Amino acid sequence: MSEIGLVKIYFGKVRDLYEIDDKRMLMVASDRLSAFDVILDDPIPSKGEILTQISNFWFKKLAHIMPNHFTGQTVYDVLPENEAKALEKRAVVAKKLTPVKVEAIVRGYLAGSGWKDYQKTGSVCGIQLPEGMQEAQQLPEVIFTPSTKAAVGDHDENISFEECGRIIGKELAEEVRAKAVRLYTEAAEYAKSRGIIICDTKFEFGLDENGTLTLMDEVLTPDSSRFWPADQYKVGTNPPSFDKQFVRDWLEQSGWNKKAPAPKVPADVIQKTVEKYREALTLLTQD
């Protein structure tokens, strides 16, 4: 990825943040891929550009629900032209916000860690569910299952809503839950009309200088969500998905112990992953 003249203030699993001034920062989506909380050596070509386009699409589409991190400026307003040109498809000029210290996870279907939790306890993150549910089944209602925010290399931990309230305050927890459920519900309805089932997703929120809850980071991408092709969806199975599942499945069967460093991922697995990301972008955004 191109070098730029701004000071880097954060290096994440996928995104890097650069200082613009005390109110704004540049968020750049790389082609890095993380799986099982380990950053892989092999990038996924164009992934950062595809994720940024999907995120920007949703930020605009859902702007009537709540404010987001957009400043209304482009990279050309803050970078020299040659730097801006290299990053225009993968960078966003974002407001500096105080992050809310929980991950806002919303689930509409029973899958992943939720399915494992249900098999053991009959509930997901302390929310009791009906008996006899199957993998990938739609939940009776959308549920909010927050988790703690881990540092790079650590694992997020699922927590109860009560614990979420203790971490960020009851009133803010209520607002985060209400907004996250509404964002998911509207997005899931739209995506379904385009042939994608959004099984679950993770939102990130921040507070602006006035304490207003604001949507930030990335929204409803194949990295932050589980997207299933509607035409291949079947209850009782683990449906294929438009995301890094290809890579995760390959790593699972490779015998890797899920600690850094990760094994080298074959080129055909990387190629299939790029195609899945592109397909999701096309389905969601084409007219």
From Swiss-Prot:
- Enzyme class, top EC level, equals ligase
Q: Name one GO molecular function term.
A: phosphoribosylaminoimidazolesuccinocarboxamide synthase activity
Regions that span the bilayer? none
One GO biological process this protein is involved in is: 'de novo' IMP biosynthetic process
Show the Pfam families listed in the entry. Answer: SAICAR_synt
Secreted among the record's keywords?
A: no
Pathway linked to the protein:
Purine metabolism; IMP biosynthesis via de novo pathway; 5-amino-1-(5-phospho-D-ribosyl)imidazole-4-carboxamide from 5-amino-1-(5-phospho-D-ribosyl)imidazole-4-carboxylate: step 1/2
**Protein name according to UniProt:** Phosphoribosylaminoimidazole-succinocarboxamide synthase
Keyword vocabulary terms for this entry: ATP-binding, Ligase, Nucleotide-binding, Purine biosynthesis
Similarity comment: family membership: Belongs to the SAICAR synthetase family.
Q: What is its EC number?
A: 6.3.2.6
Q: Where is the signal peptide?
A: none
Catalytic activity annotation: 5-amino-1-(5-phospho-D-ribosyl)imidazole-4-carboxylate + L-aspartate + ATP = (2S)-2-[5-amino-1-(5-phospho-beta-D-ribosyl)imidazole-4-carboxamido]succinate + ADP + phosphate + 2 H(+)
